[in-house]
Amino acid sequence: MIHPTAIVSNKSDIDTSTNIGPFCVIGDNVKIGKNNNIISHVSITGFTTIKDNNSFFPFSSIGAQPQDLKYNNEKSYLEIGSNNRFRENVTVNPGTVGGGLKTIIKDNCLFMVGSHIAHDCKINSNVILANNATLAGHVEIDENAILGGNSAIHQFVRIGKYAMIGGMSGVEKDIIPYGLYTGIRENLKSLNLIGLKRKGLTSNAINEIKNLINIIFDKNDTIENNIKNNFVESSEILEIKEVIEFLNSNSKRGITTFEND
């Protein structure tokens, strides 16, 4: 159903099961899948592709040009998966030349009121951005991470899976999987113990992970040497393997360490 006050380009490709409410604007190159609910006063423009069962609340702006002075009207893309919720005043921008011309959001995410996803961001599934959380360009967030209200993430930062960022925080370096961070230019406070419990880990398993994390971040040597000297073979614990893989992969901003480091 398309409301009579909505402006929908005849060049767009929209499944007939999708609802488009009052005063929405849908641009020429937009592709929208099944059973999406575009409630009212929503703008979806650019080369934006949306899969199924997403909800877009009033005054969200999806696919407008990147806020990057280097952007010069290149053809760039925004890809959105399924079962996401974009609350009021959420803004999402497509990519730029410097980031592969593509912003990607996967599935089952919640973007609360006023949150912002900048150009070239990569958001994995089951991520939550609370009210007014903002991502600068090229940020990568892995699955099940949570960002508190009014938090801000620096360009090129990576947030690992199941990480938790407290409200009003400013993050300028990468956050490891399962890390808990709060403050501005601070250190990790601990592991995200609640996130680990939600994942179904026992207390014994969590304690073992904490002990191994302490070895990796031992301040008496570098992280690289701690991994090399203590993890000759790949750890049998999945969560530790994920942390080591994260630390061994390319970082453009450096790694946020723990308070006692």
Where are these regions (language model features)?
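Structural signal for interior beta-strand "rungs" in well-ordered beta-sheet cores
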Residues: 1-187
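Terminal amphipathic alpha-helical/low-complexity segments used for targeting or macromolecular assembly
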Residues: 1-5, 10-11, 16, 53, ...
